[in-house]
Amino acid sequence: PKMPTKEGGGEGGGGGGCGCHGPGYPTPLDAMNGPRERLIYVPCILTGTGTQKPDYLATVDVDPESPDYCKVIHRLQMPYIDDELHHTGWNACSSCFGDTTKRRNRLVLPCLNTSRIYVVDTGTNPQAPSLFKVIEPREVFCKTNLATLHTSHCLGSGEVMISSIGDLYGNGKGGFVLVDAETWEVKGTWNRPGDEAPQGYDFWYQPRHNVLISTEW
């Protein structure tokens, strides 16, 4: 995930902090012509390395005019080991461009190994993000019967959707967890109960065409 300015950004820039529009850009062409990123956030995985240390989120300075160009300027360590952070996503994106109340200031980090979900505050101090919320696996299991969380994407509805690969018992199950992006409580599943795919993996959607495409591991 990327952030072009101190005020917001990521996934094509535009944090939505100006009050004239929501986050992101109205079109892909506008995104291509937007300002370049100054910071990027990189999940760093120590799970399975034998170090018994938690994964962390690295902040990298990618501003060519900065004295810290191409350097890791901050590391946010997770509170638990063996999480295996995976495909991160924002709390709000271009799907909310028309909503002036939305701001891209939270980074969502699902975990493959533990099914935990971390929510990181990138808005208060983009150079040194902090842990905002931890959604424990028990809440995910009890409300969705899904596990092994893979990819997080924000929706125009103000929710965050996270794909799953399996269930609590180790079976393959491709479903979608819905999280409220204001309260950060698990709401349930986007798919109807019993309507999961045999396997899950990545996904993306195109709201203008009312289409969602998902893949399997």
Walk through the language-model features, giving the residues of each.
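Blade-loop segments of beta-propeller domains
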Residues: 69-154
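Structural signature of eukaryotic scaffold interfaces centered on beta-propeller domains
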Residues: 4-9, 15-36, 84-103, 142-157, ...
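Short loop/turn segments immediately following the C-termini of beta-strands
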Residues: 45-47, 110-112, 122, 165-167, ...
